From Swiss-Prot:
GO terms for molecular function: uracil:monoatomic cation symporter activity. The lineage of its organism: Bacteria, Bacillati, Bacillota, Bacilli, Bacillales. Transport of uracil in the cell. GO terms for cellular component: plasma membrane. This is Uracil permease. It comes from Bacillus subtilis (strain 168).
């Protein structure tokens, strides 16, 4: 646990001025990633800001104000949302997000009763690591299309060197910030990259700023409400695309809680308990699905802010959530976000999606997965080829389809459960995942 000086404890209330300044730091840390996800999947960034704020406040309430964590849009669900939206529209994506939230809740209840051993047995690093790699690499074509083409959503793609140059400049700015900046600025390379890329795009004439000028200061976000904007319908196809991702993101959630516990110097997995943290994520994701927002997850960027500032106050986190919620209703901010060219987002995504894939590789390295063991080699190889190759199982009746990352995760879990494991390896695995 950390023994460094603490500037504000978890339950300490800051002074008004420092409260606002500390909260804005957390807002800037999560802003780039939180608005990027809805931009990539064709959802409203303003709604994502609102759901990020509401979800974080709900999380703080459920965890009894004991865990200083901020929740933002989850990158893991980008591909499944795009897939489900293509076949069933935005409403289907919201149903899928709702199901993912329910799965979080179910897992939280099981962890409360049974502990985490069963989850670690189903989803060890040899399964989760390759699936995370698939998530990142599976998004590579999306990043490339946004960077290279004038309109990545057009039926006929037209290559644009101008757009590609904007993406390249955006990527360069983001990389420079990530490597050379220090302190808080090193935590917001995505936001700085988007701003820098946007300014360069203005000089290239590919930004339409008129909607920002025309937008009202106050505007209600484009919420998607069940039974009003769509009729919810649960299908096997939606469940198959979204639910497996929820299991994979559990490992990410547990990892964040372990890191957060070390940073703050308190064992949040024991008190208030991992089950409460996951239940908080469950409620946040369900609330997001009810108004048109993407599934949520705890953000590593904000853990970085905590580590640098040594300000652990949940009141600061709550302040950031309230500001994000308010920003969602400022029409000009929403219009400004919408005016960001796809090339800028593509440039940032080159790095972000690669980092996602690299984090899966890092998980394998950190857990010392032995690839001289044929069992590990087989599980990883099959997951990677199925996931990156885009394999799918389709049943014509009922439109049921399991594809890509979801299928890779399912096959990986099955292989992990049925392939024999040496007794020595079982003992090592048990030690690695004891929480």
């Amino acid at each position: 646990m950390s023994k460094k000086k603490v500037n504000l404890g978890v339950r300490d209330v800051p002074t008004p001025f420092s409260w606002v300044s500390f909260s804005l730091q957390h807002l800037f840390a999560m802003f780039g990633s939180t608005i990027l996800v809805p931009k990539l999947v064709g959802m409203s960034p303003a709604v994502a800001l609102v759901t990020s704020g509401i979800g974080t406040l709900a999380y703080l309430l459920i965890t009894k104000g004991q865990i200083p964590a901020y929740l933002g849009s989850s990158f893991a669900f980008i591909s499944p949302i795009i897939l489900v939206k293509a076949t069933g529209g935005p409403g289907a994506a919201m149903v899928g997000a709702f199901l993912a939230g329910l799965v979080y809740g179910l897992i939280a209840l099981l962890i409360r009763q049974l502990g985490t051993g069963w989850l670690m047995k189903i989803l060890p690093p040899v399964v989760v690591g390759p699936v995370i790699i698939v998530i990142g690499l599976g998004l590579a074509s999306t990043a490339v299309n946004m960077a290279m083409y004038a309109d990545p959503n057009a039926s006929e793609l037209v290559y644009s060197l101008k757009h590609f140059s904007v993406a390249g400049v955006t990527l360069a700015i983001t990389i420079i910030c990530a490597i050379f900046l220090r302190g808080f600025l090193s935590l917001i390379p995505v936001l700085i990259g988007i701003i820098g890329g946007y300014l360069f795009a203005l000089t290239q004439g590919i930004v339409n700023f008129q909607p920002v000028l025309d937008a009202k200061w106050f505007a209600v976000p484009e919420f998607i409400i069940p039974f009003k904007d769509y009729s919810p319908s649960v299908t096997l196809g939606i469940a198959a695309a979204m639910v497996p991702v929820a299991f994979v993101t559990m490992s990410e959630h547990i990892g964040h809680q372990m890191v957060l516990s070390k940073v703050v110097g308190q064992d949040f997995i024991k008190k208030p308990g991992l089950h409460r943290s996951i239940m908080g994520d469950s409620v946040a994701t369900i609330l997001a699905s009810l108004i048109g927002g993407p599934p949520t997850t705890t953000y590593g960027e904000n853990i970085g802010v905590l580590a640098i500032t040594r300000v652990f106050s949940v009141f600061v986190i709550g302040g950031a959530a309230v500001i994000a919620l308010c920003f969602g209703f400022i029409g000009k901010i929403s219009a400004l976000i919408s005016s960001v060219p796809s090339a800028v987002m593509g440039g940032v995504s080159f790095l972000l999606f690669g980092i996602i894939a690299s984090s899966g590789l890092r998980m394998l390295i950190d857990n010392k997965i032995d690839y001289e063991n044929n069992r590990n080699l087989i599980i990883t190889s099959v997951i990677l080829v199925i996931g990156v190759g885009g394999a799918f199982i389709q049943v014509s009746q009922g439109g049921f389809q399991v594809s890509g990352m979801a299928l890779a995760a399912i096959v990986g879990v099955i292989l992990n459960l049925i392939l024999p494991q040496a007794k020595e390896e079982q003992a090592d695995t048990s030690e690695q995942h004891h929480i």
